[in-house]
A protein has these predicted regions:
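Catalytic center-proximal scaffold of phosphoryl-transfer enzymes
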Residues: 1-188
Length: 188
């Protein structure tokens, strides 16, 4: 599925859930050392103090390298688990800092999937595609009313527009990029 997503959306960023990765890393560590490894793991994802983008990702990558150096000899499988697709753990760092806590994990998506499964289980069998889409719409509509934590100010909208331009139209050598041609409004 990941390969198909890359084919269809080649410029998109894919975020791995940092919570699930933490669980996977800790599963490879003896219980008596898990609190130490867990604290070091979460230190990787502490705020970097850098603006969103490549500098912020570089700081987090340096922290991950320090984690690997610290625990590599004692827990090689845990370090290998962390380093597997590491760049996908840092995708959220390209977005506005106000969004980081909400988009670095997949809990809101999983909750929506769980609610859909629960409702389908109660119904038993859906008579057709239309009823399935109606149920899915109802679940997503209700869930979207409860999603909180992602504030959209004109500044964050501008950051997201700049990120979109970087992903869809990366600058070439000698091409001055630094301004956004679109007008940002409060309604955007």
């Amino acid at each position: 599925m990941v390969l198909r997503l890359k084919l269809v959306f080649p410029n998109s960023l894919r975020q791995r859930c940092v919570i699930h990765r933490c669980r996977n890393v800790l599963a490879k560590v003896p219980v008596e050392h898990q609190s130490e490894v867990k604290a070091a793991y979460w230190a990787i994802f502490d705020p970097t103090g850098e603006p969103p983008g490549h500098k912020s990702i570089a700081v987090a990558a340096k922290r991950a390298a320090d984690f690997s150096a610290t625990f590599g000899r004692r827990f090689p499988s845990a370090v290998a688990c962390l380093n597997d697709d590491l760049t996908s753990l840092f995708s959220y760092l390209c977005f506005p800092a106000e969004h980081h806590k909400r988009i670095r994990h997949s809990n809101f998506i999983e909750r929506t999937f769980g609610e859909t499964r629960r409702r389908v289980k109660v119904i038993g069998r859906l008579p057709g595609e239309r009823s399935c889409l109606g149920l899915l719409w109802a679940v997503l509509d209700r869930a979207s009313r409860g999603w909180r934590g992602v504030t959209m100010t004109p500044a964050t909208v501008r950051q997201l527009q700049e990120l979109r331009h970087q992903l869809l139209d990366p600058p070439t050598a000698g091409d001055p990029r630094g301004r956004v041609d679109e007008t940002v409004t409060a309604a955007a």
